[in-house]
Amino acid sequence: MNNILSEEVLNVTDFTTSRQLTLWKREDLQSPQLDDVAEEVPVALVYNGISHVVMMASPKDLTHFAMGFSLSEGIIDSPREIYGMDVVPSCNGLEVQIDLSSRRFMGLKARRRALAGRTGCGVCGVEQLNDIGKPVQPLPFSQTFNLGNLDRALKHLNDFQPTGKLTGCTHAAAWVMPSGELAGGHEDVGRHVALDKLLGRRATEGEEWRQGAALVSSRASYEMVQKSAMCGVEILFAVSAATTLAVDVAERCNLTLVGFCKPGRATIYTHPQRLIAD
């Protein structure tokens, strides 16, 4: 199989389609013209030949997505438990064919669920309400972050949204180093998928990705908190608000959750002791 870190595509226009549409401005209905629209395709994650989940996603960075999903859903504990991946066309979408260790595959089969997700929806397909939420080990308090450095990260977050700049239709997730510099980031039409891509990337990067925090351009849902905690992320910044369930989950698993992140301000929901106000 191909190396799990291989890039599927390089050109941002591979993720957009030109469609004819009509723009409206007050007192000015313009003639039809071409504009860029973000691609959204079904992506199936296939473990050892068995399809486990279908998510709607942007068709790029899919090996990172598969790695992040596998980690954040507890399918694996380590990237070493995935031996390889291939991204291949399938029907009306794409498949990520994943070579999973035998031990992990047996565990996956024991708790397999059939998911036909909406855009990055992680609850779709869960059979019972009791199945929502996974046990997460409480996080340690090993990280700190100076809020004075957050402005720098916010300023450059959209650098990782080239498709979003063309279409206005993607979410971003980026890794913020303690200095406020962004180590890297990913975009997707689904906010959960964007975060999974980031978590998958982080799992295979070097030491500079161990310190810092995750930053997302969207609101913070309970699942984004849970995914972050499952991957050992202690601090999650969100540009928009957090839900009540997200706050409850963050409190229980010792994750520092911060929303409404804007230059010079933020709302700290849980565990402020990791944050330095400078």
From Swiss-Prot:
Residues noted as binding Mo-bis(molybdopterin guanine dinucleotide) in the record, renumbered to the chain: 260-265
Keyword Nuclease: no
Active site: 121
UniProt cross-references to SUPFAM superfamilies, sorted A to Z: Cytidine deaminase-like
Molecular functions per Gene Ontology: sulfur carrier activity; sulfurtransferase activity
GO biological process, one term: Mo-molybdopterin cofactor biosynthetic process
Keywords: Cytoplasm, Molybdenum cofactor biosynthesis
Compartment(s) of residence: Cytoplasm
Gene3D superfamilies registered for this protein in UniProt: 3.10.20.10, Cytidine Deaminase, domain 2 (3.40.140.10)
InterPro entries: Cytidine_deaminase-like, FdhD
The keyword Coiled coil appears for this protein: no
Principal subcellular localization: cytoplasm
Any single Gene Ontology cellular-component annotation: cytoplasm
Family (UniProt): Belongs to the FdhD family.
Database matches in PANTHER family: FORMATE DEHYDROGENASE, SULFUR CARRIER PROTEIN FDHD
Described function: Required for formate dehydrogenase (FDH) activity. Acts as a sulfur carrier protein that transfers sulfur from IscS to the molybdenum cofactor prior to its insertion into FDH.
Protein known as: Sulfur carrier protein FdhD
The organism of origin for this protein: Salmonella agona (strain SL483)
Gene designation per UniProt: fdhD
